[in-house]
Amino acid sequence: MEPSAFYTMKGYELAADTQITTAMEDYLEMLCRLQREGRPLRVNVLAESLHVRPSSASKMLGNLKGLGYIDFQKYGAVEVTEKGLREGEYLLHRHQVLHRFFCAVNGTEDELEQVEKIEHFMNRETVNNLEQLLARMGIR
């Protein structure tokens, strides 16, 4: 892609050539959040946490398993793999950095919706730079 040329969102997504979709990121991030909280990693818990049907959660878990992010058997517990943990920890970190940023900018305590809408479109370098900016501004 030409660096200064405009493309559609789909064009940027295709050029990124990533295996994990934005929806998969949401599921993996939630699995890692549930694991941090000590909650069981089961289809019904995941579905409830994301406000989706268990069948939708089960299908997405199959996709994540196919990419090596998780292991699970139908009707069994979900286990996040090392690969999944690495990516999931980054997703949680990215979420936290953006949440701090939006709360500071908007002077609020909760910017969940804002973060959820934008987090998938921020690359690692931008998240890192934003984190450094927040640190320089004394925003923790």
State each model region's role.
Residues 14-52:
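N-terminal helix-turn-helix DNA-binding core of bacterial DNA-binding proteins
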